[in-house]
Swiss-Prot record:
Origin organism lineage: Bacteria, Pseudomonadati, Pseudomonadota, Gammaproteobacteria, Pseudomonadales
Family membership noted in the UniProt record: Belongs to the UPF0270 family.
UniProt protein name: UPF0270 protein PputGB1_1339
Organism: Pseudomonas putida (strain GB-1)
Top-level taxonomic group: Bacteria
InterPro entries assigned to the protein according to its UniProt record, in alphabetical order: UPF0270 (IPR010648), YehU-like_sf (IPR036685)
Gene3D superfamilies tied to this protein: YehU-like
Amino acid sequence: MLIPYEQLQAETLTRLIEDFVTRDGTDNGDDTPLETRVLRVRQALAKGQAFILFDPESQQCQLLAKHDVPRELLD
């Protein structure tokens, strides 16, 4: 299920994004400051280039690029 980012509390959204951008394998040796990486994800969410996917089975949220979201969820 896709969760509109606007429906999350500001602090919750920030923590979700920070968790995503600081995970192993997401920085690829990039020394970009955390604030910049968070801003980029916020912009991608606002432009519809990224989405928050909630899996009710695992009770986990994921941030996905639009091309990684199952097509049936975008319709």
